[in-house]
């Protein structure tokens, strides 16, 4: 039997950025091969730094998928844990917990051959490159494409034992925005001979707020945030260029596309009114809204509520993003939150998960996957 805490701590020490998860993949493969040895109904394939583990069912009428992400973040860890990472990277989003739970589930579900097929996906690059989309579009699944897909994300403000989801949208769709205004630099004393890109960028940031207040239906949700502006070099030089970096978030793809359209129109309009040029990049990629399948979500919620020790919470959507949304746009499925009881939030340098969640998650989720694989 594998040691979940030891595995989690080993993974926690080797976080890697998306599509660079070579040590992580090597370690995962070591544990996977330890679990599946002498089991002829299991096959393993790799795709770049991703891993697919396929359990062929004795009847195989459908394939149930379980997805976990494996990448870390470019964050310097400040937890002071004895097993803290020391390479300027950190599993500050809890993917070390995700991977460990997935390995525990693989061990549990591979004790005997299931009736239905099972696919365990260890997906790279959730944080930066939408690895789920890359794998789907790149044909990584081949003949193993699931009929239903399930996955989780840890949530610090929920307690161990809490599982939270809903029958609708769980996470927002996100779109990254990079916008550069290009004017003409000059001396601060002679503004009439220059064209101030900083002023244009500042004007744009205020104007773009009208998208949410005047273009989006008040009953819908959207966020347009610019968290970074770079312009100028010193106090007495008018900036030739101004760079803005922001994000769009919405609970439906329709609203996301509307927001992208209006942002583009406003950027072009401001540029024209200031007689400037712009360079605008909108990058949504695979970060679509995470839309749970209502029927499958109800089934999952009823199961956790009635058949396990989980405290099932029907939770409101969150404006966080997750690239599992792309896979759920292709394959019906469900994502849910898993409580880890951490005082520090996701992406924090001090985020710490309560390791008691490992045994709980493997037991409760294992019961559900066993139900899907053998009794459903």
From Swiss-Prot:
Active site: 69, 127 (proton acceptor)
Matches recorded under CDD domains: M20_Acy1_YkuR-like (cd05670)
InterPro entries for this protein: AcetylDAP_deacetylase, Amidohydrolase, Bact_exopeptidase_dim_dom, Peptidase_M20, Peptidase_M20_dimer
Presence of keyword Hydrolase: yes
Record field: catalytic activity: N-acetyl-(2S,6S)-2,6-diaminopimelate + H2O = (2S,6S)-2,6-diaminopimelate + acetate
Any one GO molecular function term: N-acetyldiaminopimelate deacetylase activity
One GO biological process term: lysine biosynthetic process via diaminopimelate
Gene3D superfamilies in alphabetical order: 3.30.70.360, Zn peptidases
Matching SUPFAM superfamilies: Bacterial exopeptidase dimerisation domain, Zn-dependent exopeptidases
Pathway, per record: Amino-acid biosynthesis; L-lysine biosynthesis via DAP pathway; LL-2,6-diaminopimelate from (S)-tetrahydrodipicolinate (acetylase route): step 3/3
UniProt KW keywords: Amino-acid biosynthesis, Diaminopimelate biosynthesis, Hydrolase, Lysine biosynthesis
Superkingdom, taxonomy of origin: Bacteria
Keyword Calcium: no
EC number: 3.5.1.47
Homology family: Belongs to the peptidase M20A family. N-acetyldiaminopimelate deacetylase subfamily.
Role, per record: Catalyzes the conversion of N-acetyl-diaminopimelate to diaminopimelate and acetate.
Protein name: N-acetyldiaminopimelate deacetylase
Organism of this sequence: Lactococcus lactis subsp. cremoris (strain SK11)
């Amino acid at each position: 039997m594998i040691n979940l805490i030891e595995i989690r701590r080993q993974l926690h020490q080797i976080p890697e950025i998306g599509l660079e998860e070579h040590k992580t993949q090597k370690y995962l493969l070591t544990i996977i091969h330890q679990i599946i040895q002498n089991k002829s109904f299991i096959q393993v394939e790799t795709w770049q730094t991703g891993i697919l583990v396929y359990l062929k069912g004795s009847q195989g009428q459908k394939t149930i998928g379980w997805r976990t992400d494996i990448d870390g973040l470019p964050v310097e860890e400040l937890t002071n844990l004895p097993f803290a990472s020391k390479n300027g990277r950190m599993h500050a989003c809890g993917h070390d917990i995700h991977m460990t739970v997935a390995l525990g589930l693989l061990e549990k579900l591979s004790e005997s051959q299931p009736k239905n097929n099972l696919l365990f996906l260890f997906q790279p690059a959730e944080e930066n490159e939408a690895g789920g989309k890359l794998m789907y579009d790149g044909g990584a699944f081949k003949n193993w494409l699931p009929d239903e897909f399930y996955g989780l994300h840890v949530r610090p403000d929920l307690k161990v034992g809490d599982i939270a989801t809903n029958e609708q949208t769980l996470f927002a769709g996100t779109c990254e925005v990079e916008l550069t205004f290009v004017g003409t630099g000059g001396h601060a004393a002679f503004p009439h001979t220059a064209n101030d890109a900083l002023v244009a960028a500042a004007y744009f940031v205020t104007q773009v707020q009208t998208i949410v207040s005047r273009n989006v239906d008040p009953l819908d949700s959207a966020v347009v945030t610019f968290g970074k502006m770079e312009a100028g070099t010193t106090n007495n030089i008018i900036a030739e260029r101004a760079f803005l970096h922001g994000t769009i978030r919405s609970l439906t793809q329709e609203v996301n596309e509307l927001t992208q359209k209006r942002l583009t129109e406003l950027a072009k309009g401001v540029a024209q009114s200031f007689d400037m040029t712009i360079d605008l990049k909108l990058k949504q990629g695979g970060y679509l809204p995470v839309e749970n399948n209502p029927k499958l979500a109800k089934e999952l919620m009823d199961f956790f509520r009635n058949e396990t020790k989980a405290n099932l919470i029907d939770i409101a959507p969150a404006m966080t993003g997750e690239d599992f949304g792309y896979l759920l746009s292709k394959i019906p499925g469900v994502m849910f939150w898993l409580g880890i009881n951490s005082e520090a939030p996701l992406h924090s340098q001090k985020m710490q998960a309560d390791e008691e969640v490992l045994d709980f998650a493997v037991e409760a989720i294992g019961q559900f996957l066993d139900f899907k694989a053998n009794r459903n």
